[in-house]
Design a protein with these regions (language model features):
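Membrane-proximal helix-turn-helix segments that form the acceptor-binding/catalytic region
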Residues: 11-44
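Helix-loop-beta element that forms the nucleotide-linked donor phosphate-binding surface
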Residues: 35-46, 50-70
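Conserved donor-binding/catalytic core segment of Leloir-type glycosyltransferases
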Residues: 66, 70-101, 107
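Short alpha-helical segment that forms part of, or immediately flanks, the ligand-binding pocket
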Residues: 135, 157-162, 176-177, 181
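Acidic donor-binding loop of glycosyltransferase active sites
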Residues: 139-152, 165
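Short hydrophobic beta-strand element within catalytic cores of glycosyltransferases
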Residues: 166-175
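A charged, aromatic-enriched C-terminal amphipathic alpha-helix characteristic of glycosyltransferases
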Residues: 209-240
Length: 251
């Protein structure tokens, strides 16, 4: 089934955050402004597959996909072949958006796994901390849990992957197809259900030999698709193709 922050298959999500977002955006000034900007602009850049899937059908001629820009970190590129005796899981918690983003489900699954395998799993949690502190707490982790209802990793998981931290979250086939990636599969994809997250975590705990390869692929994936210099050049190229760009244009 297709899923998002708002639905799972044909069923609309009824949690408070999803209801608030629908009320905020459907049939409102926000929706009208969004549509007006989309119709008036020369180009639409989407950074997640979900964004592309929303805009491309209505604006096929001016919608493009460009991955989010991420700094690369050479100091993290030397991944050891050593298999960790204890897997360090990391999860960031924003109380106001926990249910909306699926963090509540991911946390329960991670806690259950940590309880079942106390000698093999360490669970780290960052709750309501500034981003710099969040990154400091995240560093040294083996895997991050984030974005249960997404097809693609967003900024925090991408930052983690640049540091050789495995993303457990959105890694659907569409994510790889849109960037034409046929080889690398660094993301441990999960469906938006407790059982899926639990099974994925347990599989990783029981097969820690997978970790070095996934870490290396995570770094390679970011370098190949998200390096901020490469992304900036793609933005420039797209801008130059837009009808209003250039010295004689109005942009």
């Amino acid at each position: 089934d297709l899923y998002s922050d708002f639905n799972i298959g044909d069923e609309l999500r009824t949690n408070a955050d999803a209801l608030k977002e629908r009320k905020d955006w459907l049939g409102t000034e926000k929706e009208r402004l969004n549509k007006m900007i989309a119709e008036d602009c020369d180009g639409i850049v989407t950074g997640l597959y979900e964004y592309w899937a929303c805009y491309q059908p209505s604006f096929p001629q001016k919608t493009t996909f460009i991955p989010f820009p991420i700094h690369t970190y050479p100091q993290y590129s030397n991944i050891s072949d050593d298999i960790p005796k204890k897997i360090k899981l990391f999860i960031g918690i924003s109380k106001s958006r926990s249910e909306y983003k699926g963090t509540d489900i991911m946390l329960k699954a991670a806690q259950a796994i940590a309880q079942k395998y106390p000698d093999q799993v360490e669970l780290r949690m960052a709750e309501g901390v500034p981003f710099a502190e969040y990154v400091e707490m995240m560093n040294g982790s083996d895997a991050i849990l984030d974005q249960l209802y997404s097809y693609t990793p967003s900024m925090n998981p991408l930052e983690a992957m640049a540091r050789g931290i495995i993303c457990i979250g959105g890694g659907e086939p569409e994510n790889y197809e849109i960037i034409h990636e046929d080889h690398l599969r660094p993301i441990i994809n999960v469906l938006p259900y407790y059982e899926s997250v639990y099974q994925a975590l347990e599989h990783l705990v029981l097969h820690p030999e997978l970790i070095p390869l996934l870490k290396r692929q995570s770094i390679e994936y970011i370098s190949k698709h998200h390096d901020y210099i490469k992304v900036a050049k793609r933005y420039e190229a797209f801008y130059l193709l837009c009808p209003s760009s250039g010295p004689s244009g109005t942009t």
